[in-house]
């Protein structure tokens, strides 16, 4: 797969966000950055403070210049938002509408969200401990239909990644412990069955270690993960020295995944992962590709500085 790591990005001052209030940035055109560097424009706030970050995201629609998405937040206390609907105009504003949570106990530390292929309007969110929530959204809330636990959880695993891919008539899942500094991320992959009526069922699990090519200090090797239509693994990585930063991030192509012809999954990790973009000053924890485009959306959890969204070219057509 050939893609330019040319990044389009923009800077916006943070703006206060109340529930369902649009947060705007100055309207300005995104300007290209040199390959491998960070543009300093276009970031749009999703709110101020620790509870307003974005820890996972899926795009649900696109209407002209506006992108619709669902985002999860890694909040832990009662009364704090876990899931929100976002209408986002790149470089201009984000309208964030918190959603409720029904059908299960309120999750703690949601870190990823993914669409369920073949089940319109259905999603899976996964918390850092490895608990998954299969749900639909309606009437201002998530309605949980099933919970499950990821298989083969290793000691010390802290999950920030969960993605699904449907290829050759077979469904597979990839999830990952984030890793930390000298401890690499562990990628897990397995076939998965998600019947209309019944529980999630995982097949045999394949594991591979993964180290981010960038950043190199205080690094989480896998802060989010998405799978392209061709099976490429797009991974975010982040430097997190503490709640006040300074943060640094990258998006890189880590390898490939595909259900194999038997009952397993072929998981390949690149020897030298390709950095597709670097993003200084932000802690990227969410990736989402736009359908039919090389552009994707980045979401950040910048802790005390809140959260932000931006677009960049890191996807394949």
Predicted regions and their residues:
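Sequence/structural signature of beta-propeller domains
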Residues: 2-8, 13, 20, 26-317
């Amino acid at each position: 797969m050939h893609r330019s790591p040319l990044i389009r990005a923009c800077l916006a001052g943070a703006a206060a966000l109340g529930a369902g209030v649009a947060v705007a940035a100055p309207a300005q055109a995104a300007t290209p950055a040199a390959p491998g560097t960070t543009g300093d424009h276009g970031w749009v706030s999703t709110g101020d403070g620790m509870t307003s970050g974005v820890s996972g995201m899926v795009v649900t629609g696109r209407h002209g210049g506006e992108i619709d998405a669902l985002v999860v937040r890694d909040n832990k206390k009662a009364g704090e938002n876990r899931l929100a609907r976002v209408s986002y105009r790149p470089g201009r504003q984000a309208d964030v509408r918190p959603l409720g949570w029904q059908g299960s106990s309120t999750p703690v530390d949601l870190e990823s969200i993914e669409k369920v292929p073949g089940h319109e309007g259905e999603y899976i969110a996964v918390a850092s401990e490895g608990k998954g929530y299969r749900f639909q959204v309606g009437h201002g809330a998530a309605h949980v239909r099933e919970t499950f636990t990821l298989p083969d959880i290793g000691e010390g695993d802290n999950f920030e990644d969960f993605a699904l891919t449907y290829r050759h008539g077979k469904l597979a899942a990839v999830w990952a412990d984030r890793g930390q500094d000298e401890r690499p991320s562990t990628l897990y992959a397995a076939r998965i069955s998600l019947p209309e009526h019944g529980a999630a069922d995982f097949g045999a699990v394949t594991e591979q270690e993964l180290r981010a090519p960038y950043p190199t200090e205080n690094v989480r090797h896998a802060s989010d993960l998405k799978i392209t239509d061709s099976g490429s693994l797009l991974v975010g990585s982040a430097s997190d020295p503490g709640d006040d930063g300074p943060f640094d991030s990258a998006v890189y192509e880590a390898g490939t995944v595909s259900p194999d012809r038997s009952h397993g999954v072929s998981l390949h990790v690149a020897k030298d992962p390709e950095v597709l973009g670097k993003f200084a000053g932000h802690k990227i924890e969410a990736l989402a590709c736009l359908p039919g485009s090389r552009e994707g959306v980045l979401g950040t959890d910048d802790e005390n500085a809140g959260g932000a969204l931006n677009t960049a070219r890191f996807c394949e057509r």
